[in-house]
Every structure is written in structure tokens, then in C-alpha cells.
Amino acid sequence: MWIQIVDGIVIAPLLETALYQMFIFWILKLIPGMEKYNKSIIFISAIIFGLSHNFSYIYILYACIMGFVFAYSYWTYTRKYENGHTKFPPFWIVWCIHVLHNIVVFFIKNL
């Protein structure tokens, strides 16, 4: 049971932040001209994140919304990090947000 808890609360957000925010932002910005379309990148990231959580239609919708929160946070903190307004890399900030979200969900589901 503890392995599942650690996996769901710590490891999954680590991998998902790397894949669905950091990698997707990086790969889409390689497309010429795409760097101007941050809103599109945020939505693409959110949709892919949501679709990867395909337990049910409602869960996909909820995961898309959370994916939007994570992607928007990643974009926001990337800009702040690049401008020197924060010393924390956006990856770790989004990972912390995701971990806190998963902790709250875990306690709600298991109370």
C-alpha cells in the first residue's frame, strides 16, 4: 500500500510534470512560429494530460482542467524564472503543486 501511495503522490507527478509540461512545452516550441502561441501550447498540454487519465469521461474532463492548471503554472513560472523573478525552476514548482493536489485527493478519497 505504501508503494502505491508514494507512487501516486510523489513519482507520478514527477514523471507527469516532465512529460506533460516540460517535454510538451519544449517540443512544441521547436515548431517554427509556435513560441508565439503559448495559449495553444497550454491547451494542448492540458488535453494530452487529461486524455492520459482515461478512467472515465468525467475523470478525463477533470484531468484536463487540472492539466490546464499545471500547464498554465508551468508557463507562468517559466517566464518568472527566465526573468529572474523566482529562483525556483518551474519544473519543481509545478511538481509541488501536483503533489499537493494528489495529497488532497488522496485524503478526500480515503476519509
Task: State what each model feature region is.
Residues 5-111:
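Transmembrane helix-loop-helix hairpins at the membrane interface
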